[in-house]
Amino acid sequence: MTARRDFLLSTTALAASALAPGLAHSATFPTRTIKYICPWPAGGATDVVMRVLAESAGKILNTSVIIENKPGASGVLGGAELVNAKPDGYTLAQLPISVFRVPHMQKTTFDTLNDFTWIICLTGYTFGLVVPIDSPIKSIKELVAWAKENPNKFTYGTPGAGSSPHLAIEEFAQKAGIQLSHIPFKGGAQNLQAVLGGHTMAMSDSTSWGQLVDAGKLRLLATYGSQRTKRWSSVATLNELGYETVSDSPFGVCGPKNMDPAVVKILHDAFQKTLKDPAVIAIFAQFDQPIIEMNTAQYTKYAKETFVAERKTIERLGMLNKD
């Protein structure tokens, strides 16, 4: 009996010691700087918003949360970084909607549904199409008429091929029966510089153009949400104009697969609290971004459903990779 009791005690001790490193890690997390990857260039709307979120989360977690920019490839480089990162909670990323689309268009180094932990969704974008204030095109109706007379001559920039600003305009163009010329850039900053410099006729992007619209330097032709924005309430949506195109692209915080659930909860709760930070509320208002909160289970469900839905969109637009 004594031998059996000693055996049970020893096996229990071994099991506890095996769990101890993980328990100890979650109990003390975080103990060093957390990297939060922004898959867009510094200076763009997403970069600015993420820096405010990072600063707010850092105060809550009592550590530094730094932004590391990995621009290019339509915003999927954050996902590529997470695949090779340790699942310890110290490497996080923003995974834009392009991670649900690009794998249907070309080969990627990650599996969208199996390589990531969807920690929390925080917000989404307001997208819009803008032209220089001196452009002869003053409305979507005029754009459609001009494009029908000049096929493939109307140039518009986006932050990357397969991004929401790209596919929303492609879907609009398909439904309007027009052909436009797409110019992809490595993020919003380059996209904005191109339209201001006269290198493109229009810019399709999130609201990095907002202050210039308010200042009278750019004209907002339409937004892509399910309803009009509060900030530009006089501007109709593409959906409202009859083109059945809606895009808001929720995003938040993601990590590598196989993360410790306790660490996931710590990160989830910290970033959830940022949504009540006046600085975060103010930056969302500046870029007219709504709060779109989803917990880990909801965000994971959203990822699965969106991956399937985006395949249908890519196929409908004739962009599906059949290799």
Residue ranges and their predicted role:
Residues M1-L14:
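N-terminal secretory signal peptides and thylakoid transit peptides that target proteins
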Residues H25-D115, K153, A161, I178-S204, ...:
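N-terminal (or domain-start) structured segment
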Residues T31-T33, Q174-I178, M259-D323:
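An extracytoplasmic/periplasmic, membrane-proximal ligand-sensing/linker region
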Residues N84-Y90, H104-Q190, L238, D248-I283:
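Hinge/capping helix and adjacent helix->loop/strand transition within the periplasmic-binding protein
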